[in-house]
Amino acid sequence: MTMHREPGGERYYYTWAWFEGPDDAAWRVTGHHTDSGEQYRLDWNLAERSLCVTDSLGRTRCHWWDAQGLVTAYRDEAGQMTTFRWSDEERLLLGMTDAQGGKWRYVYDRLGHLTETHDPLGRVEQTQWHPVWHQPETEVDAAGAAWRYEYDERGNLQAVSDPLHQRTVYGYDRHGQVVRITDARGGDKYLQWNEDGQLMRHTDCSGSQTAWFYDERTRLERVTDAESNSTRYSYDGNGHLTEVMFADGRTERYQPDAAGRLVKYTSPAGQITRWQRDGQGRVRRQTDATGRRTAYEYDAYGRLTTLTNENGESYRFRYDVLDRLTEQTDPGGSRRVYGYNALNAVTAVIYGGERGGEIRHGLERDAAGRLTAKITPETRTKYRYDAADRLLEIRRRQHDAAEGGEPEVIRFSYDSAGNLLSEETAQGVLQHRYDVQGNRTETQMPDGRTLRYLYYGSGHLQQINLGRDVISEFTRDHLHREVQRS
């Protein structure tokens, strides 16, 4: 193949050459370009088992592989290296060193199941596997919290127990499709499927039912909710959605182009929004119902370079060699500049005013990419986490604070399932309690008063009270939507 054309009209071209190496001999792509201006040169060195790809901007990325074709190293366009280490016999990934130098290590059982993941911080996540079904039996996160899984005689997931030993149970039909879900509270949900494996009916814990109907081509034709309201869907000959008719008679219409991409939308009020697209499907212009236009410009590699809004004001964007946004300029000339680390996480944001001057915010991160400190011209804020990446403490100090002055501190604690249990500040402690479904049921305030939340069904908020006083009550319809608040 030397050329193919997408439905939108964009053409893609390829050049080839014959290569013979120590592992194989084959035709390989040596060049690639598109109508919109993308250009790539592919340089193969089969003796070294390497491939380098250079685009028209002069950016080059390279891969190296071993005799089995497994990638052993990757160098990105910024020159940053990522390396991979594989086992000799099973060819399992044993380790990876990321572009920042962080080392990841992987351990497997004798069947090749991943049992341990060690991250650059030394944290370990573990998995034990079912000996017959080769599905996880126990998963333990880096903080030691465990999720346990049970299976039936056909290998279907039968029950899940969370770190608080709260159990969710699943029932199946003869096709292995879930037909019943029993939550930790004992509430049941029921599902019914057709012979094509499509959901036909859902009955929630309150007995409310939603039904789905399909046409002979298995396309969704109608949805009838628990209030007996039906929404209907229509399609063109290619299966693209063209119309949605709601229960009250309102209609939305959609017009796709030959490639199935939306180019026109008509609202129930008859207001029309149009989109003009290029050969690759990118929106070039959007025109709303009042005739106002928003325009989008891209470079040859699909990066948004200019956005011109309805008032004719333009926002401009610049990128680095890794396609990361590095600068944004608004219509008034104000600039925002971004810096990144080797893991592509933002490490600096510089705000530039239209009259000059800059404000810099620095962001420090650990080897796992978590934000550990934010430095502004006025303050330094530190963040501390537990092994499961839950935020434990925020500590903020003014740069001009007196020697020995106390910083502002907020502390958090959690249960093993990740529910927030307490929030502590200088003003006191908020303490929270939850039901078996993870819904917050109580918040005790620093003055000793307790805010309580009452639910029904699978967690629909019904009442909030403070002591003996009702703060608010909620009335809901059969779809559990709030219809009245008092």
Predicted region positions:
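Extended charged/polar low-complexity repeat regions
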Residues: 1-486
